[in-house]
């Protein structure tokens, strides 16, 4: 229960003003975001593992896709093979990545939003979407290699495997892509193709950025829709007709660098509901690009090692499974993302409140 701000509470008085441009706000919002991300990912760790195995068409689990019983069967197989540790394989890399990722994302959103939206009149859907998209892109720039490592840890399923964080990093770094297959029709084309291959990195650090472009493209609709849906539903929950049931009293405070007032905190069920809806919307609009990204990220352990571009991966998925291939694992995605995003926004909002920002 959130404490009342009435009376002579000295700490409450100190927290009635919020300056989003202060160094303290930057640090605290980053910490709140990082903790929120870790909490959310821990809640859905097993779901995330199975979803990655489905999306990347892992040979051992591809047979379970497209069936309502596929998910529980996959969980059972992982449990029997490796126990709880198997369900959370790659989770250490997840937490290593998610703390800075979520911290940067929420911090960036607050700062970008404060500069894009200066007053209530500018509180439009377009500005909210742009703020969320830019925040998501910023976070991806700084944390993408950790995401590749996490996916590779989660992808491995062979019995007896003891791959850890350091061994996976070495594997990814040392992988050499197979030469690109091409059939040039003339000498000029052949020379150009050969030159491009020689100039294109075939191993090393570039391996940690497989799938970076679709990730960046996918972050535009995902983060944009997520923050837009959350903020919009938060407004709905605070409508006068709903406020008596959804809002905690005496929890609003002013912002020093704007003319607006920071809205009061929502009750736990209302905050979880807004986050869940945000997760559903964002997952739906961005899922095809997420599938393409996963397939690119595991390129070094499936197929012939040939490094594929977005268009080629998209084409292969369509040839293999048709348009449904772009939505493999979406049901698990919903089951995973709704509680994950709900937990993330809930912990973040509560974290900000208790940190006094």
Over which residues does each language-model region extend?
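Matrix-facing interhelical linker segments
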Residues: 1-357
């Amino acid at each position: 229960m959130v404490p009342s701000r009435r009376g002579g509470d000295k700490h409450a008085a100190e927290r009635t003003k919020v300056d989003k441009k202060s160094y303290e706000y930057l640090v605290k919002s980053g910490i709140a975001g990082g903790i929120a991300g870790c909490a959310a990912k821990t809640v859905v760790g097993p779901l995330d593992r199975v979803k990655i195995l489905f999306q990347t068409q892992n040979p051992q689990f591809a047979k379970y896709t497209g069936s309502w019983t596929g998910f529980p069967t996959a969980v059972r197989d992982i449990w029997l093979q490796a126990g709880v540790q198997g369900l959370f394989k790659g989770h250490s890399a997840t937490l290593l990545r998610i703390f800075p990722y979520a911290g940067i994302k929420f911090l960036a959103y607050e700062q970008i939003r404060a500069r894009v939206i200066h007053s209530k009149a500018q509180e439009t859907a377009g500005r909210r979407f742009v703020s969320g998209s830019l925040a998501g892109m910023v976070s991806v720039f700084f944390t993408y290699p950790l995401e590749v490592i996490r996916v590779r840890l989660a992808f491995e399923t062979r019995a007896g495997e003891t791959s850890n964080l350091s061994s996976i990093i070495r594997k990814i770094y040392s992988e050499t892509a197979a030469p690109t297959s091409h059939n040039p029709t003339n000498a000029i084309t052949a020379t150009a193709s050969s030159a491009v291959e020689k100039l294109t990195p075939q191993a090393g650090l570039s391996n940690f950025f497989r799938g970076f472009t679709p990730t960046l493209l996918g972050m535009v609709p995902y983060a944009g829709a997520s923050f837009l849906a959350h903020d919009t539903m938060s407004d709905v929950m605070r409508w006068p007709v709903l406020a008596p049931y959804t809002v905690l009293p005496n929890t609003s405070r002013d912002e020093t660098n704007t003319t607006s007032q920071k809205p009061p905190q929502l009750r736990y069920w209302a905050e979880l509901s807004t986050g869940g809806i945000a997760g559903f919307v964002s997952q739906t609009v961005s899922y095809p690009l997420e599938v393409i990204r996963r397939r690119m990220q595991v390129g070094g352990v499936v197929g012939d090692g040939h490094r594929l571009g977005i268009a080629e991966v998209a084409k292969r998925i369509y040839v293999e499974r048709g348009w449904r291939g772009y939505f493999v694992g979406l049901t698990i995605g919903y089951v995973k993302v709704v509680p994950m995003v709900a937990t993330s926004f809930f912990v973040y909002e509560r974290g900000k409140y208790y940190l006094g920002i």
